[in-house]
Amino acid sequence: SENMICGGKGINVSALLANLGYESTALGFVAGFTGAEIEKRAKELGFASDFIHVKNGMSRINVKMKSDEETEINGMGPDIRPEDVDALFKKLDGLKEGDVLVLSGSIPSMISHHIYEEIMRRLEGRGIRTVVDAEKDLLLDVLPLKPFLIKPNNHELGQMFGRELKTEEEIIECGKELQNRGAVNVL
């Protein structure tokens, strides 16, 4: 059987919040017919979107084939230019005190690997809480900026500390270390 799902961590967060009765606005980059489909599905799922429309390329198509083993084919995504990133920054400048910004997922290859840090620095002192759900270095790099909440899974937590975490005590110990490094809350 075939199934098409619009996803990505940001889309999934907004969809979950809508299901729980909370308003949110999904931000990010879309392009081409797949970007139009993402916007359409966002509306159907009950949340607002305010995407930057990228001129070249199309939003990624990731194919997952399931049988005894899962095979993954991930598309490249659109060609995000510096002016597209500037447009995102302008949208983020509209956030107000008390707002919550979720930074989630991987960073497209043509964007600075430090964009989460850049965004958090830009928001510093404005009373905006940041939640970061990302892998290893993306997460470790933002800790000095004191994110309100980080959400590493067990595997990601083990990657950050260079070991497999087998007990609840080890997980708690690593979570506390992340708080010592700057995270306000670790989920």
Regions found by a protein language model. Give the residues of each.
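Active-site core of PLP-dependent enzymes with the aminotransferase class I/II
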Residues: 110-118
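Conserved phosphate-binding/catalytic loop of the ribokinase/pfkB sugar-kinase fold
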Residues: 54, 65-97
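Short acidic/histidine-rich motifs immediately flanking catalytic phosphotransfer sites
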Residues: 95-100, 146
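Short beta-strands and strand-loop turn motifs
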Residues: 72-74, 98-105, 133, 151-156
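Conserved phosphate/ATP/ADP-binding segment of small-molecule kinases
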Residues: 117-187
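Substrate-binding N-lobe of the ribokinase-like
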Residues: 2-58
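Short, small-residue-enriched loops and turns at beta-alpha junctions
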Residues: 78-81, 107-111, 138-140, 159
